[in-house]
């Protein structure tokens, strides 16, 4: 959801030429799968466009050099990411909610089914990242 929420916010601000936004998984469980149906429903309910062609891919060590920021939704994702990218000398890796000043993980809908709570957390994090003072 975060990829599409951030793309929508960037587009609304007319900044799409300044950002390249892409999501990737830290595990291999969903590789090749489309956006999860409840996530699509949540995005649709909020008018956030998404691609039916999007397929999950796993993050790679090369992504560290490709991207300015790598954002994890929760501490578990961060631990898994550290197995793929063990070092962060440039300080690129952050937790989503750290941008909001709230010291907790994004609500995980995988276990709760509460995609609305996840959407609101991700929206808050994405909006905070676009603020001029968004360096964590």
Language model: regions and residue ranges:
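Phosphate-binding/catalytic loops
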Residues: 63, 69, 75-136
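Conserved active-site segments centered on acidic
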Residues: 1-66, 131-135
